[in-house]
From Swiss-Prot:
Name listed for the protein in its UniProt record: CLA biosynthesis isomerase
UniProt enzyme class: isomerase
GO CC annotation: cytoplasm
Catalytic activity, as annotated: 10-oxo-(12Z)-octadecenoate = 10-oxo-(11E)-octadecenoate
C-alpha cells in the first residue's frame, strides 16, 4: 500500500547508480567564440578548445524515471591539466519522465537542468532533425545527414567515447551547492563544490554525418550567446547503457565568483526578478 512514509529500503535505494540506458539521437559539435565560451567556465576548470558539443536524444530506459527527450550543450574542459571531461552549460528535458529527470539531475548531481516546452527528434532514412522550444522560441534546430563530417578531424576527439561495442569512461564536471535562507527570507549560496561524475557507456551504433545548426535566445535561455562560427559535424548514435558509477569531490570553490556562472542554466529570470512573468491563457 502506498504511503507518504518511505520504507527503509526505499531510502537506501534512493537514486542508486542512476543509468540512462537505451539512449539514441543526434550528437554534434561546432566551433564558437573562444573568449565567450571561456568566460562561461568557472574556475578551476579550464577550457580545452573553442568548441561547443551537444546532443538531442531520447532516453528510452532511465532507471529513475519514465522515458524522456533531452538536449544538452557542453564544453570540453580540464581540471588541473590532468583530468579531462565535459562541462555541461545547460540541459533541457521534455516528456513523461522529464520532471523526474530534472529533479534527479539538478538536486541529486548538481546538473544544470530545466524543463523544455517541447523537444522533437525525428529520423527518416539517412537524415534526422531535432528542435528544442521554450518560452516562445525555437532555441535549437539541428539537422544531421549521414555521410561526411563537416570537419573530419573532429572525430578524433570522440573516437574513444564512440567506439562501437567497447565500454568507454567519461568524466562530467558539475558544481553542487547549498541554498541557505536567512531569518528575513533572503537566500545565499554556500558550500559550493566542484565534483566529477564518472560515466561508463556502451555505444552500439554510430553514424557520422553533416551538421546544420541554428540557435536562438530568450532571456531565460541565451543559446545564441554561443554563436556558431563553423559546424564541425554530427552523428546519429545509440548508447545501449550509460551508467554513473562514481562521483569524485574535487574542490571547494568561492561562491561569489562561481554562482553567477551557474544560475541561468538552472533557474529562470523570475527567480531574480518578480516582474519577469509569462501569461498564457
Amino acid at each position: 500500500m502506498a504511503s507518504f512514509i518511505a520504507s527503509d529500503q526505499d531510502v537506501k535505494n534512493f537514486l542508486t547508480a542512476p543509468s540512462m540506458n537505451d539512449q539514441e539521437g543526434i550528437g554534434f559539435a561546432y566551433a564558437t567564440d573562444e573568449a565567450v565560451l571561456k568566460a562561461l567556465i568557472p574556475a578551476p576548470l579550464k577550457l580545452m578548445a573553442p568548441v561547443v558539443c551537444g546532443y538531442v536524444v531520447h532516453m528510452g530506459k532511465p532507471t529513475f524515471s519514465a522515458p524522456y527527450l533531452e538536449e544538452s550543450l557542453f564544453a570540453l574542459v580540464s581540471y588541473k591539466d590532468k583530468m579531462m571531461g565535459a562541462y555541461p552549460i545547460n540541459l533541457l528535458l521534455h516528456g513523461p519522465g522529464a520532471e523526474s529527470g530534472v529533479i534527479a539531475g539538478r538536486e541529486g548531481a548538481g546538473i544544470p537542468k530545466k524543463l523544455a516546452d517541447d523537444i522533437e527528434l525525428r529520423r527518416n532514412d539517412n537524415s534526422a532533425t531535432a528542435t528544442v522550444e521554450r518560452h516562445g522560441k525555437t532555441l535549437l534546430n539541428v539537422s544531421w545527414t549521414a555521410g561526411e563530417l563537416n570537419d573530419p578531424s573532429i572525430m578524433k576527439q570522440f573516437a574513444g567515447q564512440l567506439a562501437l561495442g567497447k565500454e568507454a569512461e567519461m568524466n562530467s564536471f558539475f558544481y553542487k551547492y547549498d541554498i541557505d535562507q536567512h531569518e528575513d527570507g533572503t537566500n545565499h549560496f554556500s558550500n559550493v563544490q566542484l565534483v566529477a561524475t564518472q560515466l561508463r557507456s556502451l555505444a552500439d551504433q554510430v553514424e557520422p554525418g553533416n551538421l546544420s545548426i541554428q540557435l536562438e535566445s530568450t532571456d531565460d535561455d541565451p543559446f545564441g550567446e554561443l554563436k556558431v562560427l563553423k559546424p564541425l559535424g554530427a552523428a546519429w548514435f545509440h548508447f545501449d547503457t550509460s551508467v554513473m558509477f562514481n562521483t569524485l569531490k574535487l574542490d571547494e570553490v568561492d561562491a561569489a565568483t562561481t554562482m553567477p556562472k551557474l544560475l541561468t542554466g538552472r533557474y529562470d529570470r523570475s527567480f531574480f526578478n518578480p516582474k519577469a512573468a509569462t501569461y498564457i491563457i
